[in-house]
């Protein structure tokens, strides 16, 4: 008898939920919660680093990312180089 009442209750509940209207909330808090976890974590980390760098000063020197930095490979050298055999087969 209880098993027959369960589908009826579920149908009534689903109909009731479909008739409810969600009221939009206009708040800054809700806008902040829309971002996904990775974006929020990245933004929080960036904000934390900006705040702490003002207090502690620069711990590491800035990274040189220009076109003449050490480690930039010349494509001609890469093409002329032979295959690398690290492991004997």
Swiss-Prot record:
Coiled coil: none annotated. The keyword Cell membrane does not apply. Residues 23-31, 74-89 form a propeptide. The modification Tyrosine amide is found at residue 70. Disulfide bonds join 35-40. Residues 1-22 form the signal peptide. It is found in: Secreted. One of its GO terms (molecular function) is receptor ligand activity. InterPro entries: Calcitonin-like (IPR021117), Calcitonin/adrenomedullin (IPR021116), Calcitonin_CS (IPR018360), Calcitonin_peptide-like (IPR001693), IAPP (IPR000443). Its main location: secreted. Pfam families: Calc_CGRP_IAPP. One of its GO terms (cellular component) is extracellular space. GO terms for biological process: amylin receptor 1 signaling pathway; amylin receptor 2 signaling pathway; amylin receptor 3 signaling pathway; amylin receptor signaling pathway; bone resorption; negative regulation of bone resorption; negative regulation of osteoclast differentiation; osteoclast differentiation. Keywords: Amidation, Amyloid, Cleavage on pair of basic residues, Disulfide bond, Hormone, Secreted, Signal. Amylin/IAPP is a glucoregulatory peptide hormone that plays an important role in the regulation of energy homeostasis. Selectively inhibits insulin-stimulated glucose utilization and glycogen deposition in muscle, while not affecting adipocyte glucose metabolism. IAPP function is mediated by the CALCR-RAMPs (AMYRs) receptor complexes. Amylin can also bind CALCR receptor in the absence of RAMPs, although it is more selective for AMYRs. Can form homodimers. Interacts with IDE and INS. Interaction with INS inhibits homodimerization and fibril formation. Belongs to the calcitonin family. The mature protein is largely unstructured in the absence of a cognate ligand. This is Islet amyloid polypeptide.
